[in-house]
């Protein structure tokens, strides 16, 4: 009686067709399975498919189970497949196998060969990680550093994701399971030859077609195929362009002219506006200085407003040329975008591509009319518009203001204190003091309505006059004195003597009478400023002049001593 044996799968015997079980059993005894080790790839036979598991026999005592999910295409019973042996005998006695790891082992080996030969591998970028991207190399995940993505920074990485493309393996570490790849190396190699060929054809003046590759604040980079060129902001249009994104967009096809090519640095400068004739060539004839025209407000700036002269051409109205009397006001508060206004051409600079315009010069200067009706010295009445720390602003009509400085409120009292006695809306009487057409200012005064009480003092105490004064107060910075018992004077410390060590106020006494020279009169207070030093210097010069022709043997000190003695 023969014994029925289970036919165990043995790779070495898989191709042998045994007719008798006894023969198979005998041959099985001679097969050595010691070469089958853990963490290796071996061949096995599918012996059963049960639910979601594939049962595989690799020639060991026990079969192994592999989830169906590990197979890209499901095998059939009897098929021979390569599997990875995780463990020869697991907890439940079964052999632990993996189809997925077997595939990866096979791929890893192929990748190692390609890496050693420097061959490119196909892969797909499918995810982003810190510092770069993940790439699927037909089942093996590799790392693509951000620096190895492209020859230039990519603004939109999604444009290169989920697309099968070639990569070069930079390094492999099987122990750690790490693979680092590069896309940039391939691009550099492929672009190098094409770049050299393209650069050999580049000449200033030729027209090319390109694609907007990147947009910056200062311009746009245009991909000309294998080389890039810079389209500067100022070379996009003859008109004003604030930012390239106003007229260009990513991946837009454009026609450009090579306006400069540096053969040493290989830098290419491009232009779009150069494809058209320069509108500035005939601008002076079209917009002569002094011509009155109309245009629409197109844009505002901190320093003025831009008006459209014609398509693609604008002129600037400086803030000071918008209104006669509101030169410091924000242009946005006086005009609106799209508003049509009348202007006069002031200047055309074809080299700098600038046209200066004026809105206010289309109108009569209201200050001229005011000056005709109110010459200097005219007394007017005007309501208070505003009060500040330094004076009062009053309404003169036609959006004009006049200013009364705090120093022009009163001859005697403190102007800053008097400001508190006025309020907005009060109508006050004042005199026109000055009209400055250049600064567009009208200066007014209240105290000028009355005679200057200090004028009499100025008439009585002329500059350089020698006067007698009595010390009434001693201060650290000088002496307060009284002239003729009615007018206050002051002598600064430095004016007390021509000798520095005698410039001490404490050397004088209250009620002491002194001689001094009038230096000046403070118009705001009527205080007379005096100098003892100037008086002494004048006396010395006078003495030298009188006695300068004396006997040369006479000592000058003796002369001065005698003069001083005579004056006692």
From Swiss-Prot:
Stretches assigned to the S1 motif domain: 39-100, 118-184, 205-273, 290-360, 377-447, 464-533
GO biological process, one term: translation
GO cellular component terms given for this protein: cytosolic small ribosomal subunit
Keywords, sorted A to Z: Repeat, Ribonucleoprotein, Ribosomal protein, RNA-binding
Presence of the UniProt keyword Ribonucleoprotein in the record: yes
Cited InterPro entries: NA-bd_OB-fold, Ribos_protein_bS1-like, Ribosomal_bS1, Ribosomal_protein_S1-like, S1_domain
Single Gene Ontology MF annotation: structural constituent of ribosome
Highest taxon above the source species: Bacteria
Keyword Methyltransferase: no
SUPFAM superfamilies: Nucleic acid-binding proteins
Pfam families, per database record: S1
Function noted in UniProt: Binds mRNA; thus facilitating recognition of the initiation point. It is needed to translate mRNA with a short Shine-Dalgarno (SD) purine-rich sequence.
Family, as annotated: Belongs to the bacterial ribosomal protein bS1 family.
Protein name: Small ribosomal subunit protein bS1
Lineage: Bacteria, Pseudomonadati, Pseudomonadota, Alphaproteobacteria, Rickettsiales
